[in-house]
Structure formats: C-alpha cells, structure tokens
Amino acid sequence: MLLKIAQGVFWILAVCLMPGTAHGNGRDVLPENTAYKVEVFRGGTWEEIFVYNARVSDYAGNPEAGYTQYTMGFALFTDSFRQPLKVRVTRRAGTFSKVEIRPLSYGIVPDVQTPNSVEFELGDPAQKVSVEFDGNRMENLFILPDLPDTAIPMGANVTYFGPGVHNAGVIRIANESGRILYLDEGAVVLGRIEAENAANLTIRGRGVFCSSQEDHGAGRRPQMEFRNCDNLKIEGILLRDTPNWTLKIVGSTGVHIDNSKEIGWIMNSDGMDFICCRDVLVENTFQRNYDDNVTIKAFNATPEYIASHTNTDGSYSDGAIWMVAGLRDFEVCNYEIRNCVFWADKAHNMLVGPEARGIAFRNIRFHDNIVLENRQDDGIYPGAMAVMIADDGTFEDIAFENIIVEDIDGGKVFCAHFTNAWAFDGLYGQWARNITLRNIAYTGTRATPSWIRGRNDAQSIDGVTIGNFTVNGTPVTDGSGPHLEINEYVRNVTFE
C-alpha cells in the first residue's frame, strides 16, 4: 500500500486512504449567513438549521468580469419525510412586502406569514427551493433537504470524510477502479479533484465540497476534473465556490450525476461540461452557476485530425488536441438530462455546442427541467435552451421536452443557430436536423423572441418539431410571430 501526502496533495493510486481527519466544523470555513434564520418543525419543537454563506455574481452589474458579488444563504438538512415537513424562515434584517418560494410550479405558498418570517411545508426532499424576499434574487436563500443516507459505504476502497472540515488540497486519483469518496452529512472538504483512468469512481454523500481556498486567479482549475473515467457517479453532495468549471468530464462513458447541488459565482463557473462523453444521465440536480449550467462539447484527436493539425515542428495548431489525446472515441451521443432545476446568472441553462471540432452530436434529450434564471442576450450566446451549430460539427436528434421557464430576468427561451463562436479556424457547423421542442412553458415578460436560424442553403436546419410551446399560456403556432423567429434556411418545420 502506497500513500503519499505532500504539499497539500493526496495521491490515491490503488490504495486505501484512511478516513479524513476533521478539524473544527463547517462553520469555521463557511461562515453563518446572518440574513436568515431557518427552522424545521419536528418532534414537536422548532429545530434551528445552520445557514451557510455562498457568493453569487450579478451579470447585470458587471457582465464582462462577473465579479459584482453578493452573498446568498443555503441550508442543508436531512429528514425522513414520512410526513410533510414544516419550515420557518425568518428574515433577520426586518420586514418585507412579499415573498416568493420558487420554483413556482411546486405551488408552495406560506401557511403563516408575519412581518419578518414565513412558514411553509415541503412534501418531499425533491422540493428544493429558493426563498426570495421582495424580489431579491441576489441575496436569496436556498432550502436544500435530502433523505438521510442509510447506506454509508465501508471497505478498503472507501475514502470517508466525516463531519467537520477536511483540508484535502488536490485529490488525484489515477489508474484504479472502484474508488469511493464519501462526504458524510456535516463534512466540508476543501480542495479539488483530478481523476484519470479511474473506472467506477463514485463521489457521494450529504456533505459539501468547497474550493474556496483554491487559486481563483490566472491559474484557476476546475473544481473536479475527470478524464477517461467510465461509470463515474456523483450523487448527493453540494459543490461550492468552484474556481473554474465545476465538473469537467472528458472522454467518459456511463456517467451518472444524481441529486448534486451547485453554487458558483465566478466567470466560467459552468456546472457540468461534458467533452467527448457518451451514455450520460443527469437527474435531480439543483444548480446555480454564474455561467452555463450544463454544456455538451467535443474536441478532436482522431489520427486524421492530428495529422491535419500538426505543424512542421511537431506542435499542434489546435492546442485542444491535448485535452482529448488518446481517447478511444470522440462521438457525442446518448444524453438524458431530467428533473433538474437550473439557475444561470449569466449564460445558458441547457447548451449543446459550440465546441465541436468536426465531431457528430446525436441523441441528446433534456426533459422535465425547470429554469429559474437566465440573462444573457448578446446575439451570440442567448438561450436558456440552446444548440450552437458551430466548429464543423453535425447535430441531430436533439430534444427539449416538458421544460418550465419561469420569469427570467432576460435572455431568450430557446435558440438554435449557426455560429463560429469558440470554433477552430472560424468554422461554422456543417448542419443540424431533427430538433424537437415539446411542452415548453414560459411565463414572464422579460425574455426576448426565440430564434431558429439556418445560415444558408447548405448550412441549414432540417426537421424541426414544435408542440405546445406556450408563452404566458398562449401557444406559439408559427415562426413569424412575436415570440419565435424561424428563417428561410430552416426546413420541414412542424407545429403540433
């Protein structure tokens, strides 16, 4: 057995890492939010739940840097939910005029309201909500319940982090199978993760993984990076304060992300970036990211691509080759993203593209998701739901179904268009076909009209199905009305 601990870095190479040593508690590192008091009623009495701080950024205040910061709160707790759970939130700053508990589609309204508090019921742990007083979305409160985890893993392959603070630094996992990192309720793990060639890797629990002490400057890295990690599973944890992308997953098959929570404030704090992955299931997540919530990308390192992008000195003209060099497959296919709640303070909530490098994208389905916020509407990157047809890629069989978009502060509900954003050599996408929008409900007044735009006769979109796309309850029935623009390079459009 080999265990090396040096300079704040944990190397895990087919070894058993002993349970982490806890120092203090999570409150030492993630200070208490002083704006809110949260209590739950159980056992005949009110029990106070600790409220943590998290930073978020206001795109309207600083759209380029994204560093106009605010402090929101989040409360994590577990309950059996054998019966509905009553929650009381007190606004310590004083009185308020109105309160919203979102998603509004949950139908949660206060049972009791005083000048500075509200009480309401949660029917099950899937009802994770944002409590917003007087329309304040920057300094709001997330209530994040879960069921207790009764299946805590044990064994030589388990790295266990118990309640308290764990200064893990960089956790590197390589060339092994079956490793489990378990963050128990009350655990706060400080650091980031790099994993490569680690099959059947699981990261789960009810704790918090926080990267607040990692470099957020020029050398910032993703919070968790996975390369060639087949059958990866991430479940139950909350990821806070990523320096860059939150989850960067490259060249991995059979990925399952379930019930994760994310709060990120910095530019590029994408929630999940999938690069050359296939057979992916994302479900039951609750995400607030400054940048994209979920984005699906590709780069290229096929022998043909490498040969055509190698300079005379042996270097690559496309530096992204290094990210995906040595992968077995590059096709992007078989994605299902379902039952998630998405909040993007700047960018997209559900994005396919634009990075493609000539790779084929197919069989991608987003369904039964809720959008709480979206803002960007700059002519290049709009769309709570978007397909950016770029970078010599091909895109087919992409569906968005049963999506609720609440009263977002700006942006568009949907966009599919040709672009050369983030493309190598300025290439647009080749073509797109079979795009479906079904049961899309937007309620609000601030979103601008959606787009579906081909580029020319050759670079076109062929086969668009639109069924029950409504704006404030009114069906969208054509592509020339006030809510949807479809241009002449989009063919075979069907309104159901």
Where are these regions (language model features)?
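Residue-level detector of intrinsically disordered/flexible regions characterized by low predicted structural confidence
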Residues: A6-V9, K233
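Bacterial N-terminal signal peptides
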Residues: G8-L17
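Extracellular/periplasmic carbohydrate-active domains that bind, remodel
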Residues: N25-E496
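Boundary at the C-terminal end of the N-terminal hydrophobic targeting segment
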Residues: P19-G24
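N-terminal secretory signal peptides that target proteins for export/translocation
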Residues: M1-K4
